Design a protein with these regions (language model features):
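Compositionally biased, long intrinsically disordered regions
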Residues: 1-35
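Conserved binding/catalytic microenvironments
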Residues: 29-336
């Protein structure tokens, strides 16, 4: 489907939702809102999540954040028996808005959305959503180099293990626990967590995750995170081998993520002292970053630029550095 047509289809779905044109009954107290409205919000979120990997965040962030506001307006109007489910959906949209903000490089806004998502997840009583949001907050702390909060939040997510039903969500939680252990230099613990995440991802069924929270946490995703963990542990050559293996089989539907992981491979190749390997993946990653407007990918590429300055006398390296530098923004490293 063409980009413009796809965005138009999403807009057509959004326009029939609360806050965007749907004629709802006047707020006469509890029970004033048809509970089926919740299903409509869920369908819209599913469409936005599907669009995210193909289109990037720029075309979606406004629609997602508008739906959070629309949902919040319904909390006082929805009947009591449906309120918990509405809080679930509000938490899902807030988490997704935070994810989009992160991808645009606005980490302050992303963290604010995650805090709101955690509040609503606790209000809903849904442990899958609460664990997932804590995992995401750990990622955000890791993005910003805040090791202690990243580790503590990952451990908080793991403490939900016995309550979480979704295997994909549990896999996502354990792979982030692996990153946390690697940040603390605990190689054995990190690899054990990654093995657990791999087993969960391999065995996961779609019915385990009705809200499609951790559906991205596939076997391929866990494998590419293993490469990132090796890099954090300082084993850059092994990390590069892992990246090369998994990227050969990367799903086409995760186009934006392909760019992100190629950018991370570029950083690893530079740290391993391999400028040609860094250029190979960096050039493709930059093209995808431009196509999908992913600031996270650009941030990773800017990290690689700092490592590649020693090879700037090579014309191809100099050209790459200039191209990445022209993208603006700041350096840094992010996960998901």
């Amino acid at each position: 489907m063409q980009r413009r047509r796809f965005i138009g289809a999403i807009a057509g779905l959004a326009v029939s939702l609360p806050g965007t044109g749907l004629d709802l009954p006047a707020p006469t107290g509890r029970g004033a809102v048809d509970p089926q409205v919740i299903d409509h919000f869920i369908r819209l979120r599913d469409a936005l999540v599907s669009a995210d990997s193909l289109l990037g965040p720029g075309d979606l962030v406004r629609s997602a954040s508008e739906q959070v506001g629309a949902i919040a307006e319904l909390y006082e109007r929805i009947e009591l028996r449906s309120r918990g489910r509405l809080f679930e959906v509000g938490a899902l949209f807030a988490e997704f808005s935070g994810w989009l903000a992160d991808d645009l490089g606005d980490f302050g806004t992303g963290r604010a959305w995650s805090s709101k998502a955690l509040e609503w997840a606790h209000s809903s009583g849904n442990p899958d959503i609460a664990a997932f949001v804590l995992m995401r907050m750990s990622q955000q702390a890791q993005f910003l180099g805040e090791r202690a909060p990243a580790v503590a939040l990952a451990q908080a997510a793991v403490r939900y293990e016995g309550q979480v039903a979704g295997s994909h969500v549990r896999a996502a939680v354990h792979q982030q626990a692996a990153h946390a252990a690697a940040l603390d230099g605990q190689e054995r613990a990190a690899l054990d967590c990654m093995d657990r995440a791999q087993a969960l991802a391999d065995a996961a069924q779609p019915t385990d995750d009705p809200y499609v929270l951790g559906s991205y946490c596939t076997s391929s995703y866990v494998a590419v995170q293993r490469a990132a963990v090796f890099s954090t542990l300082g084993d850059h050559r092994r990390a590069l081998d892992e990246y090369d293996h998994v990227m050969q089989q990367w799903p086409r539907s995760f186009h934006r993520e392909r760019g992100l992981h190629l950018a991370r491979r570029t950083v690893v190749a530079a740290r391993a002292g391999l400028p040609e390997a860094a250029l190979e993946s960096g050039t493709e990653a930059l093209k995808i970053a431009r196509d999908t407007q992913s600031r996270r990918t650009v941030r990773e590429l800017k990290t690689s630029v700092g490592l590649m300055l020693r090879w700037r006398a090579l014309p191809s390296v100099d050209e790459f550095i200039r191209a990445v530098t022209s993208e603006g923004g700041s350096g840094g490293s992010a996960q998901r």
